[in-house]
Design a protein with these regions (language model features):
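Acceptor/aglycone-binding surface of glycosyltransferases and processive sugar-polymer synthases
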Residues: 1-66, 91-110, 115-117, 121-123
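Hydrophobic pocket-lining residues within nucleotide cofactor-binding pockets
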Residues: 87-89
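A short, conserved alpha-helix in the catalytic core of glycosyltransferases
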Residues: 56-61, 66-85
Length: 126
């Protein structure tokens, strides 16, 4: 399939047949549902690393640490169309993930609130 992309877009990968543990799959599914409910960001799998966008749209977004989780909401706030494409998931070849539930949960909640406030400000100004 070929996407016909117009200006102002973000393409997000959506991992099919994830190669993660049951615990990771469940926690990711819950986090995605909460994020999607709060931000209405049109992205099914924000933890998937595949993100394709135009640099000029990206540079309009205010940078903050861990913003990669919220790129769909931030792009949508700037009137970009969000597309989801299915991608194959692969096991990590080298190294290991340093992320755990404990070191992501509270930071994720705080950032979710920050982005929610940003999107509400954007609605008032836009």
């Amino acid at each position: 399939n070929k996407l016909k992309l117009k200006n102002k877009f973000l393409v997000c990968g959506n991992r099919k047949e994830r190669q993660d543990s049951v615990h990771k799959k469940i926690s990711s599914r819950i986090a995605n549902k909460i994020r999607k409910f709060v931000l209405n960001d049109d992205c099914n799998d924000t933890a998937c690393a595949l993100k394709v966008f135009d640099r000029k749209d990206y540079t309009k977004i205010e940078y903050f640490k861990n913003m990669h989780r919220y790129l769909p909401a931030l792009f949508k706030m700037n009137n970009c169309k969000i597309y989801n494409v299915m991608v194959d998931d692969r096991m990590r070849t080298y190294g290991y993930s340093k992320y755990t539930f404990n070191n992501r949960f509270w930071i994720g909640i705080i950032d979710l609130v920050k982005v929610w406030i940003l999107t509400k400000k954007g609605e008032k100004n836009g």
